[in-house]
Amino acid sequence: MRLNADLSRPATVDSAALAWVASPMAGVERRMLERDGDEVARATSLVRYAPGSAFSPHTHGAGEEFLVLEGVFSDETGDFPAGFYVRNPPGSRHTPASAPGTAILVKLRQMPPEETAAVRLDTRDPALWRDLGQGRQEAVLFEAPWERVVMLRLAPGHAGAAETWPRGVELFVVEGDVAIDGTTHRPGAWLRLPPDSRLTLASQEGALLYRKTGHLG
């Protein structure tokens, strides 16, 4: 299966408008944003676990990254409520489950072999955040030569300057609204822009965004 698989082309998906599609595991559903492959695939998706559901044990050959959007995600390493950011490096193995139910933004098979450390961060911890000025705050979640991942908070009424991303940029709207080059996007919107893209962010209500850069070029 190929969905938004050409990384040299821009892609925009309003995930809130997509139907949930059943996965091979009972109680686990997906909304696919990008995919290149079948069940073992390079993929970015929203995944929803019904209360009491679980996935079978599995190994992530090329890693897994996810942000908990709702509920509580659990595995052998702990319980992670909404706001937690997790990276499981290539070769890691776990058995995901959720007692109360959960929804996550997850990226699969997108890590190089050089990545070896697990990451567990609570993005709601004030100590992670720094003020960038001009109505922007940032929490750095991961930084390496191959990519940089942050949570970005925009104040109500924010109007930013145009920025160019030489190695591409990916955004997911977690809360609020964000206008990108004049088009307003709301929670669940996902955008991927190729290298050398230029964009301007603004927000009327304020916004919380997941942003990844440097990974597309």
Model regions and ranges:
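A short, N-terminal "cap"/entry segment at the start of jelly-roll beta-barrel domains
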Residues: M1-E39, G101-R148
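Ligand-binding loop in jelly-roll beta-barrel domains
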Residues: V28, D79, P90-E115, T184, ...
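Short histidine-centered beta-strand/loop micro-motifs
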Residues: S45-L46, S56-H60, T77-G78, P96-A97, ...
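Glycine- and acidic-residue-biased ligand/ion/polar-headgroup-sensing regions
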Residues: A50-P51, H60-D75, W165-D181
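Histidine-centered metal-chelating micro-motifs
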Residues: S53-S56, S74, V86-T95, A159-G160, ...
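Surface-exposed interaction/gating patches
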Residues: T123-P126, R130-I180
